[in-house]
Curated annotation (Swiss-Prot):
Belongs to the YbaB/EbfC family. It comes from Christiangramia forsetii (strain DSM 17595 / CGMCC 1.15422 / KT0803). Keywords: Cytoplasm, DNA-binding. Gene3D superfamilies: Nucleoid-associated protein YbaB-like domain (3.30.1310.10). GO terms for molecular function: DNA binding. This is Nucleoid-associated protein GFO_1796. Homodimer. It is found in: Cytoplasm, Nucleoid. Its main location: cytoplasm. GO terms for cellular component: bacterial nucleoid; cytosol.
Length: 108
């Protein structure tokens, strides 16, 4: 019984290490998003850190339009990054979890 517990504890530690490694890797995964007309471009990591914002000079003439573009485009980029992040972290966690009877449906 204690051997099984130690095995499960080791598996949990491995799963935690795998999740941490995945988080670090997601710092290098870039997500690009742009406004519908391409005048605003944003690049963020899958961990939702902004890396670059490119604004066409045409947008500098209208502050309200620029603000709207920033909000919409940032939200789309964050949504994409969050989907990637959750899928990758979830897969890493699920892959490393020990087989515990009755827990099958919790990590889907």
């Amino acid at each position: 019984m204690f051997g099984d517990m130690m095995g499960m504890m080791n598996k949990l530690k491995e799963a935690q290490e795998k999740v941490e490694a995945t988080k670090k890797r997601l710092d290098t995964v870039l997500v690009d998003e742009q406004s519908s007309d391409g005048l605003l471009k944003i690049t963020i990591t899958a961990n939702r850190e902004v890396k670059n914002i490119s604004i066409d000079d045409k947008l500098l003439e209208d502050k309200e339009q620029l603000e709207d573009y920033l909000v919409l485009t940032m939200n789309k980029a964050i949504e994409k990054a969050t989907n990637i992040n959750e899928a990758e972290i979830g897969a890493a966690a699920k892959d490393g979890m020990p087989d515990i009877p009755g827990m099958d449906g919790l990590m889907k």
